[in-house]
């Protein structure tokens, strides 16, 4: 459990669709941003190629990009997680898979894997947290969205920062990473409320100084 908690500290999520604000090719922009984030000390990366302007419809290009991201993460010994796409995760031997409440069922993932990957599950209600708190096949909860976010058009209702405290007050000790509209100034507060780490997209992908951003996000 401690290894998972450490992994969640500064959890970067991105796909090419999150890098279109920069000049040049979005896939190359993603690789550049990821390399800088790895050099700065992120503790986990989730490849999330979803939504408008993503490569979701070009499976070959998506796989090639995922492999390049995986190779970068391997160089820095940082876990590489794939968002929902079980087939992709298994074919490139990703370290883990993250799923939402409406995504691929955890049981389906386990039926298709020989060696259990790291599995993360998105949580948006206390009922969901209680229902899954004792499941050994789920390694961590992604809790949110904490704040409004533009990175996901169909996000669940906001839960707010105090939701993390409520989870801990129920005696749930499952590793938790807070997600959704998190900025640098919120990270330390969320940790004090009980989060093991923060997951961000725009805070890093839009940062003008990734090294400083990662350093601030890691502060306790």
UniProtKB/Swiss-Prot annotation:
Pfam families for this protein: TMP-TENI
Domain of life: Bacteria
Co-factor remark: Binds 1 Mg(2+) ion per subunit.
GO biological process, one term: thiamine biosynthetic process
GO MF: magnesium ion binding; thiamine-phosphate diphosphorylase activity
Recorded metabolic or biological pathway in which this protein acts: Cofactor biosynthesis; thiamine diphosphate biosynthesis; thiamine phosphate from 4-amino-2-methyl-5-diphosphomethylpyrimidine and 4-methyl-5-(2-phosphoethyl)-thiazole: step 1/1
Binding site for 2-[(2R,5Z)-2-carboxy-4-methylthiazol-5(2H)-ylidene]ethyl phosphate: 149-151, 181, 201-202
Catalytic activity annotation: 2-[(2R,5Z)-2-carboxy-4-methylthiazol-5(2H)-ylidene]ethyl phosphate + 4-amino-2-methyl-5-(diphosphooxymethyl)pyrimidine + 2 H(+) = thiamine phosphate + CO2 + diphosphate; 2-(2-carboxy-4-methylthiazol-5-yl)ethyl phosphate + 4-amino-2-methyl-5-(diphosphooxymethyl)pyrimidine + 2 H(+) = thiamine phosphate + CO2 + diphosphate; 4-methyl-5-(2-phosphooxyethyl)-thiazole + 4-amino-2-methyl-5-(diphosphooxymethyl)pyrimidine + H(+) = thiamine phosphate + diphosphate
InterPro entries recorded: Aldolase_TIM, ThiamineP_synth_sf, ThiamineP_synth_TenI, TMP_synthase
Cofactor(s) the protein requires to work: Mg(2+)
The keyword Mitochondrion is annotated on this UniProt entry: no
Listed GO CC annotations: cytoplasm
Residue numbers binding Mg(2+): 84, 103
Keyword Metal-binding attached: yes
Task performed by this protein: Condenses 4-methyl-5-(beta-hydroxyethyl)thiazole monophosphate (THZ-P) and 2-methyl-4-amino-5-hydroxymethyl pyrimidine pyrophosphate (HMP-PP) to form thiamine monophosphate (TMP).
Name the UniProt record assigns to this protein: Thiamine-phosphate synthase
Gene name of this polypeptide: thiE
